């Protein structure tokens, strides 16, 4: 396991590491508490001062907030390099976005090795999944 970044809990009882393909939490003795997979190398990890959340940023620029207690991903956030567009989404698909930010994500569905995958932009499902209020409450 090659560690890219580390963060220490405020009470020094445990720490979090970012690696290629995961964020992991260990106790003071070095025993694993949880392992949360990622789709990319984790470049940075931070623990909130109240030890409630872990923030990670991966090599693609996607930020993820995880629950400190179990590593569950609560919210994803992608700010585009143009500084104007962004999108935030939950693992269940609810999202909020800046104007034109909906174009940044969608669902990629594989259809087998001999067929091209399908891509469904998130905006196709706006009426069901665009829920700014749900996204805003996630980190409360």
Enumerate the language-model features and the residues they cover:
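Blade-loop segments of beta-propeller domains
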Residues: 39-42
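Structural recognition of the beta-propeller blade-terminating site
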Residues: 26-27, 67
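Residue-level detector of Asp-centered blade-edge/turn motifs that repeat once per structural unit
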Residues: 10-11, 49-50
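Eukaryotic protein-protein interaction scaffolds centered on beta-propeller repeats
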Residues: 1-4, 21, 33, 60-140
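Hydrophobic core register within WD40 beta-propeller blades
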Residues: 6-8, 45
């Amino acid at each position: 396991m090659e560690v890219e970044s580390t963060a220490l809990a405020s009470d020094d009882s445990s720490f979090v590491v970012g690696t290629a393909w995961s964020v992991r939490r260990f106790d003071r003795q070095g025993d694993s508490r949880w392992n949360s997979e990622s789709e990319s190398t984790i470049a940075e990890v931070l623990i909130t001062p109240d030890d409630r959340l872990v923030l990670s940023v991966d090599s693609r620029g996607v930020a993820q907030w995880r629950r400190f207690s179990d590593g569950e991903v609560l919210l994803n956030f992608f700010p585009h390099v143009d500084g104007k567009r962004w999108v935030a989404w939950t693992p269940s698909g609810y999202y909020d976005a800046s104007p034109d930010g909906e174009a940044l994500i969608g669902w990629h569905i594989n259809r087998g090795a001999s067929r091209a995958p399908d891509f469904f932009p998130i905006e196709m499902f706006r009426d069901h999944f665009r829920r700014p209020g749900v996204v805003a409450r996630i980190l409360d």
